[in-house]
């Protein structure tokens, strides 16, 4: 047991967060994300699966532990953009995004979520350090985080 470490974060996640370096990318994925396929190509090489939690819960647990690259990256936190067909249908901004903003703003009050086109998001995820797939069932629930420096 450790003090001040959220209990929902298993040791494997803590090790990954610690091993990541400045500029490395972490993907917090929803339940529909092709996690096993993409995770094979990441630095970590395998999927971490946390099906009992959603992305907001995991983000809330790591936000005070994981520095974001606000100094050198325009958007150190990015969501997968709506597809053109979903925009054409008039789909509103996904509810998950406001949740992510609210959680991130606890540590980073001026943060703005970036957006990445769906297939570009998948390509960036393949180059990530690690993919953590959750039980997130809200649409467009994927989140990309760029690690910064501990100062």
What is each model feature region?
Residues 12-19, 57, 61-65, 99-103, ...:
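Alpha-helical scaffold segments in soluble metabolic enzymes
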């Amino acid at each position: 047991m450790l003090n001040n470490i959220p209990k929902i974060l298993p040791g494997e996640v803590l090790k990954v967060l610690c091993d990541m370096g400045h500029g490395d990318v972490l993907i917090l994925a929803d339940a529909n994300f092709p996690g096993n396929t993409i995770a094979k190509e990441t630095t970590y090489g395998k999927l971490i699966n946390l099906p009992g939690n959603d992305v907001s819960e995991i983000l809330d647990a790591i936000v005070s532990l994981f520095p974001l690259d606000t100094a050198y990256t325009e958007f150190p936190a990015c969501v997968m953009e709506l597809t053109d067909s979903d925009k054409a249908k008039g789909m509103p901004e996904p509810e998950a995004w406001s949740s992510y903003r609210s959680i991130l703003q606890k540590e980073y009050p001026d943060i703005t979520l970036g957006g990445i086109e769906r297939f570009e998001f998948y390509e960036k995820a393949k180059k990530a350090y690690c993919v953590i797939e959750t039980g997130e069932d809200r649409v467009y629930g994927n989140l990309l985080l760029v690690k910064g420096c501990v100062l």
